[in-house]
Amino acid sequence: MVKSIIGAMKYDSGEVKLNGKPVHFLSPHDAIQEHIAFIPENRKEEGLFLDTSIANNMFMVNYNRISRKGILRKKLKKNFLNTFFSKLDIRPNDPEKPARDFSGGNQQKAILAKWMAIEPTIMILDEPTRGIDIGAKAEIYKLMDNLSKKGCSIIMVSSEMTEIIGMCDRVIVMAEGRVTAELDRTEFSQERIMAASSETTQKAG
């Protein structure tokens, strides 16, 4: 579903609204122009070019921030990297190393840095902490919380119950392509979410 929202996949029915107005993104580029960021579930196949430097991965949607009149500026490039490597504590502090040489947590932080640089108003994260260690998870949760406090709306897709309950203000449960529940913080619990997630299957049985 989230790929349909950003124009990466076509949808058969329904509509997407932004600030109360219908929008139809033909490609992810259209979504980027509206400051909508998307962090995919499979970072190694969809989020990064593993044999390319982590720096160039971060520049791919931010070329205008490190160039003037189409010409790359070394000072802007250096400042950009210093800012985000420091802010997100990306390690090792070597932006010219290939992305594959970074741990899963640091790869994910580099992807977040790339999209944070566009100053998103909406950030969609698909399974943002899958396959990373506990320490990196805590850092990513903190980054998400800070973005939210600055006014960025966060849409997180997750299959981890503790993550959902710990991070979300509102939960929308989907099962077999349809919404089965919409719960705010005062309403949701593990039991209610699990019941809603199996609702369609139970009806079919």
PLM segments and residue spans:
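Glycine-rich phosphate-binding loops of nucleotide-dependent enzymes
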Residues: 1-205
